[in-house]
From Swiss-Prot:
It comes from Mus musculus. Residues 30-194 are lumenal. This is Transmembrane emp24 domain-containing protein 4. PROSITE patterns: GOLD (PS50866). InterPro entries: Emp24-like, GOLD_dom. Keywords: Coiled coil, Endoplasmic reticulum, Glycoprotein, Membrane, Protein transport, Signal, Transmembrane, Transmembrane helix, Transport. Residues 213-227 are cytoplasmic. It is a single-pass type I membrane protein.
């Protein structure tokens, strides 16, 4: 009987680990410092047809108080997003704090870059700028209270909607993993094929070199009348 229960239990554990992995990968919260002309970029692995929401706010370094304070409204941030093919998905100027959204149409590494317009702002005065950035991917980007109010969903219906969105996100993650595995397989096959042809080329070169040396030695010995 114990052997019968191990399979389903392992399946549940694996599914739970996958859910935790997906949930951990769906939200990014961090802060970083940038200078006047510095651009900071991040790479985010995103499945296709997935919504991404980024929220940020900026703080400026006060030299007198030696503390970071909320930035003035005049200071802005430029956000640029590129897909795995290098195409610009989003390029827009925002304020000192804001929110940007985009939907991926190609699976893979998306580049998210931010830089300030401080080169035009005298108030920056060569100081530091702290940027708090929170990136939410997939179903974590949904505002469920707003959805519940708009669609007039009960608590049970809202929970069912959340579970369906989570399952959909897991399916997208699995599709993306299969896509990566397929790319890795093609790369491995291409590499193995190149190694094989290079080995064949080396063998042919070695054989031709040996034949040439034998003929050269034969000609040498014949010239010396040793054979």
């Amino acid at each position: 009987m114990a052997g019968v229960g191990v399979g389903p239990l392992q399946g549940m554990v694996r599914f739970g680990l996958l859910v935790l992995t997906v949930c951990a990968a769906c939200a990014r919260g961090l802060y970083f410092h940038i200078g006047e002309t510095e651009k900071r970029c991040f790479i985010e692995e995103i499945p296709d047809e997935t919504m991404v929401i980024g929220n940020y706010r900026t703080q400026m370094w006060d030299k007198q108080k030696e503390v970071f304070l909320p930035s003035t409204p005049g200071l802005g941030m430029h956000v640029e997003v590129k897909d795995p093919d290098g195409k610009v998905v989003l390029s827009r100027q925002y304020g000192s704090e804001g929110r940007f959204t985009f939907t991926s149409h190609t699976p893979g590494d998306h580049q998210i870059c931010l830089h300030s317009n401080s080169t035009r702002m005298a108030l920056f005065a060569g100081g530091k700028l702290r940027v708090h950035l929170d990136i939410q991917v997939g179903e974590h980007a949904n505002n469920y209270p707003e959805i519940a109010a708009k669609d007039k969903l009960t608590e049970l219906q809202l929970r069912a909607r959340q579970l369906l969105d989570q399952v959909e996100q897991i399916q997208k993650e699995q599709d993306y993993q299969r896509y990566r595995e397929e790319r890795f397989r093609l790369t491995s096959e291409s590499t193995n094929q190149r190694v094989l042809w290079w080995s064949i080329a080396q063998t042919v070169i070695l054989i031709l070199t040996g034949i040439w040396q034998m003929r050269h030695l034969k000609s040498f010995f014949e010239a010396k009348k040793l054979v």
